[in-house]
UniProtKB/Swiss-Prot annotation:
InterPro entries reported in the protein's UniProt record: Ribosomal_bL33, Ribosomal_bL33_CS, Ribosomal_bL33_sf, Ribosomal_zn-bd
GO biological process assignments: translation
Organism: Ureaplasma parvum serovar 3 (strain ATCC 700970)
Family: Belongs to the bacterial ribosomal protein bL33 family.
Official protein name in the record: Large ribosomal subunit protein bL33
Lineage: Bacteria, Bacillati, Mycoplasmatota, Mycoplasmoidales, Mycoplasmoidaceae
Transmembrane segments: none
Length: 53
C-alpha cells in the first residue's frame, strides 16, 4: 500500500500557508514545489512543502 501523507504548502514570497494536499512519500521523497495562486500576494507564486512543527 502507498504511504500517503498530508503536506502543507507555503508561499515563497509572503510565507503564508495557503494549501494543504497529500503526496505519496515513497514515490516522491523530495520536497513538493508547485505554482499556485497566493491570495495574500494576489498573484501566482511558487509554493513549497514545509515540515510539520
Amino acid at each position: 500500500m502507498a504511504i500517503k501523507r498530508g503536506v502543507r504548502l507555503q508561499c515563497n514570497e509572503s510565507k503564508s500557508i495557503n494549501y494543504i494536499t497529500t503526496k505519496n512519500a515513497k514515490n516522491n521523497p523530495d520536497r513538493l514545489s508547485l505554482n499556485k495562486f497566493c491570495p495574500k500576494c494576489r498573484k501566482v507564486t511558487t509554493h513549497v512543502e514545509i515540515k510539520k512543527k
